[in-house]
């Protein structure tokens, strides 16, 4: 089984992939990097985002909010 990291944009249904990995652990590490980059783009302080990234790594997904509404999902998906 392999694992992919992806982001699904809810408004357009566009999917962006961030790599394919041999283990779920590797994919979750990449998920953390992708989220950190997304937080930086949005100007979210890294210390504030760190706790959210830890939860995302445990769960394997994260819903991203902008202006109080969920705009996209980041997730690890097995295939």
For each of these PLM feature ranges, what is it?
Residues 1-17, 69, 77:
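Short aromatic-glycine-(Arg/Gly/Cys) micro-motifs in beta-strand/loop hairpins
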Residues 2, 20-22, 54:
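Ser/Thr- (and often Asn-) enriched beta-sheet segments in non-cytosolic proteins
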Residues 5, 21, 27, 31, ...:
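Hydrophobic beta-strand residues in large extracellular and virion-surface proteins
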Residues 6-10, 24, 53:
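Generic structural signal for short, flexible, solvent-exposed coil/loop and linker residues
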Residues 12-13, 22-45:
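A short, charged, amphipathic alpha-helix used as a generic interaction element across diverse proteins
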Residues 35-79:
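Short, mixed-charge low-complexity intrinsically disordered segments
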